[in-house]
């Protein structure tokens, strides 16, 4: 991540990465076929952390609305916080990885939606949320909060954590209000 921040994606080489972590270039190629694969692996690990955190919140002993609210906030803010050190090169990285990333995003978001759907279904069963397809509703929440993810923000917005946090809270509140039984 430091190397990305310093050199940008285009200028970063596998040689640079090997030097940075103190191993031979060959050792890197034992695990990864290219720097693209290394970057995608980094993104995969970030999404794994997001899903772990969502599961942890889903299992908490807290009101259902609070759990869902916190899950929506976390899925945005974990990503925001993780790209801060290379936010200037984020567009460059995404430009190079776009085709591969688009394939993975569908899977990432589908997996996150399944976790959200568990809480939505529980809230529906308790009479708190209106009936409906919990997974479809979860996918709608994912799509609605995706506009707050780092790749959707401008460089200026990426620098303002307070603004992104505030906007994410407002969005989560609005979305959850739309799920309530009337």
Describe the function of each predicted region.
Residues 3-37, 41, 45:
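Helix-turn-helix
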Residues 41, 45, 55-82, 137-141, ...:
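Hydrophobic alpha-helical connector segments
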Residues 6-10, 61, 82, 126:
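Short coil/turn segments at alpha/beta junctions that flank glycine-rich nucleotide-binding fingerprints
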Residues 49, 71-82, 126, 144-151, ...:
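Phosphate/oxyanion-binding loops and surfaces in catalytic or ligand/nucleic-acid-binding neighborhoods
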Residues 39, 43, 47, 98, ...:
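Amphipathic, non-transmembrane alpha-helical scaffold segments
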Residues 70, 74-115, 135-136:
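Short secondary-structure transition hinges
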Residues 119, 174-178:
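C-terminal alpha-helix
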Residues 87-91, 102, 124-171, 182:
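Hydrophobic/aromatic-rich alpha-helical bundle segments in the mid-to-C-terminal region
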């Amino acid at each position: 991540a430091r190397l990305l921040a310093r050199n940008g994606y285009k200028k970063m080489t596998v040689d640079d990465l090997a030097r940075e972590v103190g191993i031979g270039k060959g050792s890197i190629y034992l695990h990864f076929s290219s720097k693209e694969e290394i970057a995608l692996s980094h993104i995969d690990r970030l999404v794994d952390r997001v899903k772990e955190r969502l599961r942890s919140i889903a299992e908490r002993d807290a009101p259902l609305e609070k759990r869902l609210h916190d899950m929506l906030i976390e899925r945005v803010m974990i990503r925001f916080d993780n790209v801060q050190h290379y936010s200037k090169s984020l567009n460059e990285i995404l430009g190079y990885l776009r085709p591969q990333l688009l394939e993975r995003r569908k899977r990432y978001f589908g997996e996150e939606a399944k976790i959200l759907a568990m809480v939505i279904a529980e809230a529906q069963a308790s009479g708190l949320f209106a009936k409906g397809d919990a997974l479809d509703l979860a996918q709608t929440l994912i799509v609605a909060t995706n506009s707050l993810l780092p790749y959707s923000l401008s460089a200026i917005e990426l620098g303002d954590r307070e603004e992104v946090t505030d906007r994410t809270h407002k969005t989560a509140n609005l979305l959850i209000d739309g799920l309530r039984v009337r």
